[in-house]
């Protein structure tokens, strides 16, 4: 089926009508079950997140904001990053968006932009953040050559012992049993973080995991 979008979809979100929205190289794609619609804001959209109401939050290069419908249902883009001070404008791509405690978090490489009641707070990181995850209302980030951190307030709290695998590119952080974390690396297998220790998870597929690039992962109940 021709959908009229670009060649790559980065993330997918769904609204209360079960309509699908895809962050696409050509803009925001909407599928209502019958047909595709493209809403373009002239940017490659890297990530999209539906807030459970009427907004589809999106992130792009040096820009983030939201699409919302007009009285006829047509989606229009509203930039939030346009209100930033000039010194914060060059933040590169926004790759992840989360809702935590009624605030929206936009995560780029060196900045987290927290939207609360239409006000934006800027949280800066010296190291590049290459991966992030919202786990049980906690925002975790992997910082290049530094390890995994819990972000809270304006602070990044290091998870002890994760620095020993900080030169491995962690591509995914997942919840695991008994409040542990699974740290998925691109070429060095899977690690378990348990309070203060980080150890390899030995599996029958270790050779495959270490010879393949692990770009994303998900926990399944079965």
Question: How would you describe each model-predicted region?
Answer:
Residues 1-222:
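Carboxylate-rich, polar loop motifs that coordinate divalent cations or form catalytic acidic clusters
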């Amino acid at each position: 089926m021709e959908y009229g979008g670009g060649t790559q979809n980065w993330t997918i979100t769904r609204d209360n009508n079960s309509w699908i929205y895809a962050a696409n190289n050509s803009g925001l794609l909407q599928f209502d079950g019958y047909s595709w619609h493209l809403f373009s804001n002239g940017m490659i959209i890297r990530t999209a997140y539906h807030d459970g109401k009427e907004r589809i939050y999106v992130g792009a290069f040096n820009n983030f904001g939201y699409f919302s419908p007009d009285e006829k249902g047509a989606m229009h883009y509203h930039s939030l990053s346009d209100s930033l001070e000039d010194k914060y404008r060059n933040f590169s791509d926004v790759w992840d968006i989360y809702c935590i405690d009624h605030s929206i978090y936009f995560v780029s490489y060196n900045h987290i932009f927290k939207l609360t009641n239409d006000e934006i707070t800027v949280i800066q990181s010296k190291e590049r953040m290459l991966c992030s995850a919202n786990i049980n209302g906690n925002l975790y980030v992997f910082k290049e050559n530094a390890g995994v951190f819990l972000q809270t307030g304006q602070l990044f709290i290091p998870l002890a012992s994760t620095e020993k695998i900080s030169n491995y590119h962690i591509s995914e952080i997942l919840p695991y049993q008994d409040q542990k974390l699974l740290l998925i690396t691109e070429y060095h297998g899977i690690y378990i973080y348990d309070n203060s220790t980080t150890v390899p998870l030995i599996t029958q597929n270790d050779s495959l995991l270490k010879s393949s690039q692990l770009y994303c992962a998900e926990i399944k109940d079965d």
